[in-house]
Amino acid sequence: MECVFGLVGNGFAIVAADTSAVHSILLHKNNEDKIMVLDSHKLVAASGEPGDRVQFTEYVQKNVSLYKFRNGIPLTTAAAANFTRGELATALRKNPYSVNILMAGYDDESGASLYYIDYIATLHKVDKGAFGYGSYFSLSTMDRHYRSDMSVEEAIELVDKCILEIRSRLVVAPPNFVIKIVDKDGARDYAWRQSVKDVTTAVV
């Protein structure tokens, strides 16, 4: 029951993802961070098979870092998204990754942006996007309330509405979410929305 969604506001982009590590009917942990910081001004929120998700996002992160190391300048968000799409398309003909990605970033020239990349290497620049079962509810909620000139506070309020809708509509809804933001000041954690915490000590 993975849920990943994001939106672009006035000078920033926000992505949110559930934090449940699930296999079949088993929940392994409630604090799995599915949003990776690619570099100082890029975020990748991913859903899909856990092994593919971790391996592919780390592969993209290392290649983005390698490009900056070799050339002395970072990739733009559009370039990083196109690189990611290209790698997914190449793998699709050999050993496909079951992973869907929302890439958010901020560039000095073009500002904040959000890219939708699915497991068959479809790439679109979007104002809002979502993957997983939660997309049925988060997309409709964002369609109703989203504006391109939203402030950070308004965008977070909309994200909370989406999380509430997902929790109230899905039979097996993920309890916890992580929210991250990227703007001119960089990519960073914004908040966690927790209704369940991992039990770290055994109960006798």
From Swiss-Prot:
Give the Gene3D superfamilies listed for this entry.
Answer: Glutamine Phosphoribosylpyrophosphate, subunit 1, domain 1 (3.60.20.10)
**The protein's name:** Proteasome subunit beta type-2-A
The job of this chain, per UniProt, is described as: Non-catalytic component of the proteasome, a multicatalytic proteinase complex which is characterized by its ability to cleave peptides with Arg, Phe, Tyr, Leu, and Glu adjacent to the leaving group at neutral or slightly basic pH. The proteasome has an ATP-dependent proteolytic activity.
PTM sites of type N-acetylmethionine = M1
Q: Which CDD domains match?
A: proteasome_beta_type_2
Where is this protein found?
Cytoplasm; Nucleus
Primary location recorded for the protein, binned into one broad class: cytoplasm
Please report the organism this UniProt entry assigns to the protein.
Arabidopsis thaliana (Mouse-ear cress)
Q: Is Cytoplasm there in the keyword field?
A: yes
Family classification: Belongs to the peptidase T1B family.
Q: How does it assemble?
A: Component of the 20S core complex of the 26S proteasome. The 26S proteasome is composed of a core protease (CP), known as the 20S proteasome, capped at one or both ends by the 19S regulatory particle (RP/PA700). The 20S proteasome core is composed of 28 subunits that are arranged in four stacked rings, resulting in a barrel-shaped structure. The two end rings are each formed by seven alpha subunits, and the two central rings are each formed by seven beta subunits. The catalytic chamber with the active sites is on the inside of the barrel.
Q: Which UniProt keywords apply?
A: Acetylation, Cytoplasm, Nucleus, Proteasome
A cellular component annotation (GO) from this entry? vacuole
What's an example GO BP annotation here?
A: proteasomal protein catabolic process
Keyword Cytoplasm (UniProt): yes
Q: Which domain of life is it from?
A: Eukaryota
